[in-house]
């Protein structure tokens, strides 16, 4: 079905099948669709509301068009959809180093700031990591540092057909939620944060359709795309071969002190670099450390390295206190810049 017919179908209020969504995405990612058609499809989907099948179909094509990173071991990604406008520091990036220090191999996929001041690419670059790596160099980082970073705009060249349209129409589209589903290393273990609670179930079902091994879809209290300390957090546990399981968890459930959202606030790149280093070095013992531990615990559960969040929290603490998390950062800086791990 040509993309023009799919636009008409969506405008009439009908959902696309997973295969139809993949066909539309194929036209977009190969440059066959005109900018007007891309804008119309994205806007119509946004107004109708994307289904899990539509999200999964488009994600399959985006994965297929990405430059692949080959690595023969189970990989974990920690990322979110963004868009929460909370101005927190780089929680999932900090948690990634803590999880790596506890033995998970982390293939982090991210970009520069979109809705925030400092994205994962920005803070990693500020920390001294070379973010402009090719696939072979990322695989080397995974092997020698236990963590690697894939700069989204470098690994998704087909996005050149979409970028100008997204900027011109100026609304959030399905592409804002496809990024976390399109890891170039095909990480099958994942923590995926969503700012919109209505999106959590859709993303969980999409991950299930995409054949994820183990993922935690999380929505933080107060509308964050991270687990927070301020109230009940939604978690949807998605495992291959199992029905997704939904539950809530608070900081107090795990013995962590509650803290308001304001306690997690970050700033520009220099501020967030100092925060991340402070946590990993053990100097920062504030609520920022606790929220990083909580999200690292979730990452370790998703990586199948922890039995539950309490066990994950215990391992995350050891990663920080032993210096293993900081060592992963230092090693990534060295290896990404061409040194030996």
UniProtKB/Swiss-Prot annotation:
Record-listed 5-phospho-alpha-D-ribose 1-diphosphate binding positions: 80, 83-84, 88, 90-93, 108-116, 120
InterPro entries xrefs: Anthranilate_Pribosyl_Tfrase, Glycosyl_Trfase_fam3, Glycosyl_Trfase_fam3_N_dom, Glycosyl_Trfase_fam3_N_dom_sf, Nuc_phospho_transferase
Keywords assigned by UniProt, alphabetized: Amino-acid biosynthesis, Aromatic amino acid biosynthesis, Glycosyltransferase, Magnesium, Metal-binding, Transferase, Tryptophan biosynthesis
Required cofactor names: Mg(2+)
UniProt-annotated binding residues for Mg(2+) 1: 92, 226
Pfam family, one: Glycos_transf_3
Gene3D superfamilies registered for this protein in UniProt: Nucleoside phosphorylase/phosphoribosyltransferase catalytic domain, Transferase, Pyrimidine Nucleoside Phosphorylase, Chain C
Pathway in which the depicted protein is active: Amino-acid biosynthesis; L-tryptophan biosynthesis; L-tryptophan from chorismate: step 2/5
UniProt-recorded Gene Ontology molecular function terms: anthranilate phosphoribosyltransferase activity; magnesium ion binding
Ligand binding (Mg(2+) 2): 225-226
Glycosyltransferase recorded as keyword: yes
Cofactor binding description: Binds 2 magnesium ions per monomer.
Catalytic activity, reaction form: N-(5-phospho-beta-D-ribosyl)anthranilate + diphosphate = 5-phospho-alpha-D-ribose 1-diphosphate + anthranilate
EC number: 2.4.2.18
Binding-site positions, anthranilate 2: 166
Keyword 4Fe-4S applies: no
Broad class of enzyme this protein falls into: transferase
Cellular compartments per GO CC: cytosol
Function: Catalyzes the transfer of the phosphoribosyl group of 5-phosphorylribose-1-pyrophosphate (PRPP) to anthranilate to yield N-(5'-phosphoribosyl)-anthranilate (PRA).
Subunit structure: Homodimer.
Family that this chain belongs to: Belongs to the anthranilate phosphoribosyltransferase family.
PANTHER family (alphabetical): ANTHRANILATE PHOSPHORIBOSYLTRANSFERASE
Annotated protein name in UniProt: Anthranilate phosphoribosyltransferase
The species this protein was found in: Roseiflexus sp. (strain RS-1)
Chain's gene name: trpD
